Amino acid sequence: MLRGLTTVNFFADDLSAAQAWYTELLGVEPYFVREIEGVPAYIEFRIGDYQHELGFIDRRFAPPGQSAGGTMTYWAVDDVQAAFDRLVSLGATVHQEVREQGPGFVTASVVDPFGNVLGVMYNQHYLDMLGGSGE
């Protein structure tokens, strides 16, 4: 039934600002931009080892009652502290400090300037699966 993660979508009130912030963070431009009446409505980046999709939707299209939080998504990083420090230096606020969750699992999370919770994680299991392609 569930074949795998396809796209992680966040909402933002100011999609142009979100595009600029995430372009700076990720070091790449979005590969896809959809505009409605000349205003960005959706942007999407491809990131990571498998080119996963990270999309941003103008909050005017959010379902009723949509707010920050909810599902926690963690992105694999090699150095959680360095990633956390960079996110904070770019203007994100601390959601959870760097924390060891067990052997081979270190996490941290921030709230981006657009109200989305963004987690980063060092996960040895992910690396083990990646090494063997995990497929």
Language-model features: where?
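A cross-family glycoside hydrolase active-site/sugar-binding cleft signature
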Residues: R46, I57, Y74, E97, ...
